[in-house]
Structure formats: structure tokens, C-alpha cells
From Swiss-Prot:
GO cellular component: ribonucleoprotein complex; ribosome
Protein family (similarity comment): Belongs to the bacterial ribosomal protein bS21 family.
Keyword Ribonucleoprotein attributed: yes
Gene responsible for this protein: rpsU
Pfam families registered for this protein in UniProt: Ribosomal_S21
Name of the featured protein: Small ribosomal subunit protein bS21
UniProt source species: Aquifex aeolicus (strain VF5)
């Protein structure tokens, strides 16, 4: 959990900037997005395979355009 201690007389903008930096440093938002929807391992595998095929097809199309 991220905690930021506010000093007396410190501008709120500075505190927010420090808070955002700590959240980013601890990768809280990326972890939250990753865990937002559970994806079973089988789905992850299928998704990786689809992306791999898409990438290969894209490379082939690009290569054929150059010829």
C-alpha cells in the first residue's frame, strides 16, 4: 500500500505528484489491470497463439507488398 506523508504547508500538487510516482514505481495500476478480469491459462495460451499468427501474417503481407 502506498503512503505519502503530507508535510505542513506543502502544496497538494507536490503531494499528488509524489503519490503518483510511488504508485507507478510499485506498478499498482498495471497489476490492477492485469487482475481485473481473470484469464485462465488456456485462454492466455490461445491469445498468445492468435497474436503470433497475426504478427506472422502481417509480416508476410508487408513482404509481398515490397516485391
Amino acid at each position: 500500500m502506498v503512503t505519502v506523508i503530507v508535510q505542513e504547508g506543502e502544496p497538494i500538487e507536490k503531494v499528488l505528484k509524489r503519490f503518483k510516482a510511488r504508485v507507478e514505481q510499485e506498478q499498482i495500476l498495471t497489476e490492477l489491470k492485469r487482475r481485473e478480469y481473470y484469464e485462465p491459462p488456456s485462454e492466455r495460451k490461445k491469445k498468445r497463439e492468435r497474436n503470433r499468427r497475426k504478427k506472422i501474417l502481417k509480416a508476410l503481407k508487408k513482404q509481398q507488398q515490397l516485391i
